[in-house]
């Protein structure tokens, strides 16, 4: 094994998971087991991101509006402020202080096109992939949506999680 003695006693801003993995982020996932839930995932995204403080800044809307106004008023392209978009992007950053849950770094909304029809092997592969996401050390927790009628069932997902980590919490 490599000599790691020079790093003994050092710390970093991270999260140690119960299985020994270490993450540098604390994200929550919203995952559907079937593509029929994708619309619900999108509705949740629209409702949650802004209200909980995780919405990305709308970097370009104002700049595009200004460019359109200038264009429609007859100004030539040479007089349009090309630097405005870049300046706006540089000044925008996510404001962690506005988050309802300050120790949660983000909410990730995943969608896919599987889970319903197809073969059982397809459903098994999907559940294995989703279990990998759930087991990632940067994931603090998840909300899993299921209709109950799809091939990719919650017990199948639980089995795949257990294969990756029998003590998953």
Residue spans of the language-model regions?
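Metallocofactor- and cofactor-centric catalytic cores in central/energy metabolism, strongly enriched
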Residues: 1-169
């Amino acid at each position: 094994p490599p000599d790691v003695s020079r790093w003994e006693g050092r710390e970093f801003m991270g999260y140690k998971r119960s299985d020994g993995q270490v993450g540098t982020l604390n994200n929550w996932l919203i995952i559907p087991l079937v593509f029929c839930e994708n619309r619900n995932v999108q509705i949740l995204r629209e409702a949650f991101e802004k209200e909980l403080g995780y919405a990305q800044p709308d970097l370009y809307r104002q700049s595009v509006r200004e460019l359109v106004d200038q264009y429609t008023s007859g100004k030539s392209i040479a007089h349009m402020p090309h630097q405005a978009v870049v300046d706006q992007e540089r000044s925008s950053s996510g404001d962690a202080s506005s988050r309802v849950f300050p120790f949660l770094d983000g909410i990730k909304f995943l969608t896919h096109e599987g889970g319903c029809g197809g073969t059982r092997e397809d459903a098994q592969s999907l559940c294995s992939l989703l279990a990998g996401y759930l087991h990632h050390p940067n994931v603090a927790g998840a909300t899993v949506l299921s209709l109950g009628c799809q091939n990719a069932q919650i017990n199948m997902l639980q089995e795949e999680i257990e294969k990756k980590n029998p003590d998953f919490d």
